[in-house]
């Protein structure tokens, strides 16, 4: 049996990590474990009843929700989004449907986060590490460096009342979002361009001192900027849609992401040196506009919650398979994997 990380241990770890980054960690939230568990249980109960008769208990209104995803088809979060769309249409008897746009068709991450707040976009898979920038502090702690030792430990948290509490804390922050569930891509690691590899003397492994002065592209979030700065790099916030050309032109020396995103977006073509530092986990969160959420009745909310659970499972299963497939393809793709030989200095 896997040992789940406790709420106390989790908050202790994130407090230490946040202090190391010079950040404020929320040791608590207006959400409580008992409240979040009740919300989760109620949603599961309602959703189970809904499954017995698709569409029963709904308002009878038809809803077409718009979902934007910044990645392409060959990506876990996109697989999760498709699963969500199929499940919610099934559970609602066709009364709730999803229009899914991929490759950032409707905007960047920052534009999508703002769109959710303003109500011009219904659903977006955002990064938990971005949410403190928009007023939801507690859930952002999942993006702190080295909080989770592996994906199994994160899954333990996601399946627990603590996972429910973290999701509930977004709604309780009253910042315009409701967190429906998780879409996690796994560990995020560094990758560097050939020019940087040459400059570093063509290393056979990677050490923390090599991070010094590297211009590293990060998402437009304070947490990721502070993380890279703490590792000795020079963090540069650039929109995801501009990352490929920024690496190609030398605007940045390196970037960081999960290996599935690295491959599906062809970043390996311009940065074929992948460093296995796994400094954080890509804790994606399915976000909905709060006013839109409040417009649904209890049965409809139950269907949406169940669809989010199905999406999380599909995303997780896809990523488990794809991660290994990506690493197995490195040799054929001309990618060099650089192991970190002093990982204790990074943690």
Annotate each predicted stretch with a short phrase.
Residues 2-21:
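N-terminal secretory signal peptides and thylakoid transit peptides that target proteins
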Residues 15, 28-29, 55-153, 172, ...:
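N-terminal secretory/targeting leader peptides
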Residues 21-22, 165, 312-315:
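A short hydrophobic/aromatic micro-motif that marks alpha-helical segments and, especially, helix-coil
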Residues 34-56:
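Ser/Thr/Gly/Pro-rich low-complexity, disordered linker/stalk segments of secreted
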Residues 151-165:
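A gly/proline- and charged-residue-enriched helix-loop-helix capping module
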Residues 168-170:
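Short, hydrophobic/aliphatic alpha-helical segments
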């Amino acid at each position: 049996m896997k040992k789940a990380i406790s709420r106390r241990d989790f908050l202790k770890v994130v407090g230490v990590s946040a202090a190391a980054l010079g950040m404020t960690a929320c040791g608590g939230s207006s959400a409580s474990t008992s409240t979040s568990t009740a919300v989760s249980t109620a949603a599961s109960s309602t959703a189970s009843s809904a499954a017995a008769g698709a569409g029963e208990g709904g308002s009878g209104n038809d809803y077409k929700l718009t979902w934007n995803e910044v990645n392409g088809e060959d990506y876990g979060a996109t697989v999760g989004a498709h699963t969500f769309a199929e499940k919610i249409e099934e559970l609602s008897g066709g009364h709730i449907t999803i229009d899914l746009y991929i490759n950032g068709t409707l905007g960047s991450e920052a534009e999508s986060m703002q769109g959710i707040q303003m109500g011009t976009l219904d659903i977006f898979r955002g990064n938990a590490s971005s949410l403190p920038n928009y007023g939801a502090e507690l859930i952002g702690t999942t993006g702190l460096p080295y909080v989770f030792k592996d994906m199994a430990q994160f899954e333990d948290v996601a399946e627990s009342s603590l996972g429910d509490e973290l999701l509930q804390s977004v709604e309780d922050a009253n910042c315009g979002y409701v967190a429906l569930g998780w879409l996690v891509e796994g560990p995020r690691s560094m990758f560097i361009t050939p020019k940087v590899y040459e400059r570093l003397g063509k290393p056979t492994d990677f050490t923390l001192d090599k991070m010094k002065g590297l211009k590293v592209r990060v998402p437009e979030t304070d947490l990721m900027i502070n993380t890279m700065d703490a590792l000795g790099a020079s963090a540069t916030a650039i929109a995801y849609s501009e990352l490929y050309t920024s690496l190609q032109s030398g605007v940045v020396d390196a970037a960081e992401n999960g290996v599935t995103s690295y491959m599906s977006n062809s970043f390996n073509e311009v940065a074929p040196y992948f460093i296995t530092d796994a400094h954080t986990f890509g804790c994606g969160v399915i976000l909905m506009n709060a006013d839109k959420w409040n417009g649904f009745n209890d049965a409809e909310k139950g269907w949406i919650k169940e669809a989010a659970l199905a999406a999380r499972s599909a995303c997780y299963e896809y990523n488990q398979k794809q991660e290994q497939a990506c690493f197995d393809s490195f040799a054929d793709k001309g990618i060099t994997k650089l192991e970190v030989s002093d990982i204790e200095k990074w943690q």
